Each structure stands twice: as C-alpha cells, then as structure tokens.
C-alpha cells in the first residue's frame, strides 16, 4: 500500500492548488461562457496530419562483445484534431525495429514493424488557466504543465525524469493550472495497464515555475511498488549555453533507495543545436556521458550525430556513436 501519510499530503496539495481560488475564478468563467459558446458554434473541426521518420546507423564498442553496425528506424504519424479551437485530440501511430539495438537511444523505437497506436489522449481547456487531459494511452509526463529542463532529453541516453514521470504507457486523467506569472501545478492519475487497480495506479503531482529564461519543477510519483521525488531546474542566459540540472530519488518497497541525476548544457547556433550532458542512466546508478548535434539541412531534414560513453556492470565502459537522419512530413 502507498504510505497513508504521503497520500494525504498529495491530496492536500491537490485541494490547495486547484480549489483555493475556485470562488474567485467562477465569476470570470461565467463571463466568458456566452462569448466562447458563440465561437464554438462557428468553429469547424480540423485535423492536421504530421509525421517524422528517423534512420539510425550506429555502433557500440565494449570489451565483452564483438563490434557491429546497427541500422534501425522509427516512424511516427501524428493526428491532431480540434473540435472547438481550444482542445486537441492527439493520436500517434508508431513503428520501429530497435528492440534488439544495444544503442538504446531515446530517439529509437521498439514498437515493432507493424504500425501501432502509441498515444491516444484528449486535452481541453476550462478557461485561460485550467486544462484537463484524459485518454486510454499516454505517457506519464503528458499533461504536466511544468517545464523541467531546457535540454533535449529525447535524443540520446540520459533522462532527468526516469522515476518521477514514469508510469508506463496506459490510461490517464489529469488537471493542470498555468498562471500568467509562470506558476503552474498539475495532478494526474495514470496506470501502466488498461486494468486500473492498486498494483498499476500512479499518482503524479507537480508544482513549477516557468519563465522565459529560467524555471523548474518539483514532482512526485506514488505507486504501490515505489515512491519517487524529484527537483529540476534550468537557466538560459543570453549568448551562453542553457544549464539544466535535475535529481530524483526512488524509494522502493524493498527499502532500497536509488537516485537519478543529470547535468546538461545546450546551445543554439546559426543552423544547429549542440548538447552535452552527464548523469546516471540506469537503476544501478551507472554514469553516462553524451553529446549530440542537431544540424538543420532544410526545414524537413536534419542530421543528428550522437556520441556517448556509459559505464557497464563489468566496471568497463561502452563507447557508442550513431548518425541519425530525421525527415519531417
């Protein structure tokens, strides 16, 4: 069972954030109903289709295995449908053959060669501040209002929210609030299975601050098997690389506590972005280093070289390199 004290704190947080100013907000909502209704009546549903295709060719060098080249792909098709202009029904179809790839890059897909739905969710607004999300298939981080990093963690091997937003792929429902001063808060119930029960359910809560050049979040993730807590922050100075840092702790039901941390820099240049980072990449707290560059060849075509080093269980190092091409359509 999730610790009662922690759950009560999470519920108290939820009530404070979302209902404290409910009375003050109700009048503003009522005043907008008539004008919004008129706009919705004139709005015709629209659907936009976008896609991305990654080719990844790379190799991994380690002392315990022979070197070889690996060539994989990831294909995603995104359908965004809006019924009244302030909502979005997102459907993502995905395929990819990187299940056996030793590179284990975030931009690789392990879904298999058959096109499958990987995300299906509906997002809608109550007013200018409140937003809700619901769907049968989504990731734990989707629907959270806060911005935790200025670094692109969707390319290589490091991720600063491995535990605090990890709920697998499954159903979820959440509500979030964004204020004009940058403060935000989110509460989400998610599951890693279509059968939602005490074993699979996750309670994810987050508070944060997002400004143009700095921000951060505090996030918790409560589950029967673990409780995770994390803090993340970023700063984007002018004419210098952005700095992002995060640390999170995962308390297992076995009594073991593991941590995950990332320190990263990212810089935008004339036609490219460059990023470097160091941090832990697995539950054994092994250290990894990564560097990448995203080079814009055209609006629809990018080349992304990736280089990484990671410690393994034999106290040696794995050296990896890949050339990735991204096509947008």
Spans of model-derived segments:
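Outer-membrane beta-barrel and related beta-rich outer-membrane complex signature
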Residues: 103, 144-148
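Beta-barrel outer-membrane channel/assembly domains of diderm bacteria
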Residues: 22-132, 159-189, 199, 208-210, ...
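Active-site-adjacent "lid" and substrate-binding segments of diverse enzymatic cores
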Residues: 192-194
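Short, solvent-exposed beta-strand-terminating loops
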Residues: 94-96, 139-145
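Residues on the solvent-exposed faces and adjacent turns
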Residues: 136
């Amino acid at each position: 069972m999730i610790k009662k004290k922690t759950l009560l704190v999470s519920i108290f947080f939820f009530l404070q954030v979302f209902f404290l100013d409910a009375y003050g907000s109700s009048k503003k909502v009522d005043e907008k109903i008539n004008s919004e209704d008129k706009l919705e009546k004139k709005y015709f549903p629209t659907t936009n289709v976008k896609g991305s295709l990654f080719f990844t060719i790379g190799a991994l060098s380690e002392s315990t295995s022979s070197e070889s080249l690996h060539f994989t792909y990831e294909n995603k098709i995104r359908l965004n449908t809006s019924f009244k202009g302030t909502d979005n029904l997102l459907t993502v179809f995905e395929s990819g053959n990187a299940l056996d790839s030793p590179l284990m890059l975030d931009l690789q897909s392990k879904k298999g060669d058959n096109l499958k739905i990987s995300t299906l969710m509906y997002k809608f607004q109550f007013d200018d501040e409140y937003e809700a999300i619901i769907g049968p298939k989504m990731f734990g981080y989707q629907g959270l209002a806060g911005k935790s990093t200025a670094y692109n963690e969707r390319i290589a091997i490091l991720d600063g929210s491995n535990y605090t937003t990890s709920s697998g792929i499954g159903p979820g429902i959440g509500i979030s609030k964004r204020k004009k001063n940058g403060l935000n808060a989110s509460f989400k119930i998610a599951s890693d299975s279509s059968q939602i029960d005490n074993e699979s359910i996750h309670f994810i809560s987050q508070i944060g601050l997002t400004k143009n050049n700095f921000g951060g979040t505090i996030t918790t993730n409560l589950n029967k098997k673990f409780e995770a807590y994390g803090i993340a922050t970023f700063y984007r100075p002018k004419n210098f690389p952005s700095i992002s840092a995060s640390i999170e702790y995962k308390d297992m039901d076995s009594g073991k506590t593991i941590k995950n941390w990332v320190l990263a820099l990212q810089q935008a240049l004339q036609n490219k972005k460059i990023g470097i980072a160091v941090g832990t990449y697995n539950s054994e707290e092994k250290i990894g280093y990564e560097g990448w560059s995203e080079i814009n060849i055209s609006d629809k075509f990018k080349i992304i070289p990736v280089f990484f080093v990671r410690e393994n269980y034999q106290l040696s190092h794995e050296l990896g390199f890949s050339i990735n091409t991204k096509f947008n359509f």
